[in-house]
Amino acid sequence: MTFEFAKRPTIKGYPELRWTGKRPYESTQYYPAQLREQYGETINGWINKIFWGDNLQVMSHLLKDYRGKIDLIYIDPPFDSKADYKKKIEVKGVGKTQTDTNSFEEKQYGDIWTNDEYLQFMYERLVLLKELLSDTGSIFLHCDDSRNFYLRCLLSEIFGEENFRNEIIWKRSTATGLATKRCGTLHDTIYWYSKTENYYFEMQYHEYEEDYLKRARKDENGRMYIPIPTGNPGPRPNLYYEYKGYLPHANGYKWTREKMEELDRQGRLIFPESPDGRIQYKQYLDEMKGTKLQDIWLDVYPVNPVAKERNGYPTQKSEALLERIIKMCSPQNGLVL
């Protein structure tokens, strides 16, 4: 069984990443794959699955049943960090002496590549992942500063720059003293692309930061609120009008005159003392879920050495990080790879 891939049309002036030995990846064969493990109880005929083997062959295997059906993909590929990653394996029943230990290190994978090998490796897998993704699906690619600039070019070439959604900065570690002649590296990068413009998204929130809460005020009923501008973020000439002697921002108000009058009756407007000032709006804290999630994630911590979820894998990512991504871009009962 052969699977053919639709080739993205060549657009004049559209950038494309080139490297020595770049080979088009326009089809693949169906491969049998080894279903290694299953987790949980069957739900509507589905059970969580883990495949072991070369991921290119496993994805080719998945095309038969899941082409265009996967709602969310998260990948944490090799970073080309020029290092070998090892996991400490405990040996039961072996006591420590001065000359031996009760554990040994097992190599998990080597992350040392030449440029052309690495780029071809990632290119072929991203093409396959696009084929697996549903039209409302998203892909999140986790990387660091080793090759992130190349990976973004590849993602834009395959998924289209118009489907780029965010470059997420995740603070993965605390300060380190390893860097002596440059700034220390504290973050990873997560690129988010969608398959189309019609992608699933559920806004996520996090707790209010202390600096934000310092701006809060209390109304006559004891409710806490934040004063926010009433100006429109974009030019709206039809919403530019005077209200009770006060002019809006140059873009106009956010709301129609009728809506402003309704907010005024509710006591939601704050009028300035100066005639040249601008009206503000009371945004009550108890009406909001928190602060809307932005593209810098400082509140999701890496797996600490004594965490229950830690399995010893050298580049393990936290469950909290994956939970946030899944809640944000996978519908209920969605299919996640």
Could you tell me what each predicted segment is?
Residues M1-L337:
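Core catalytic lobe of class I
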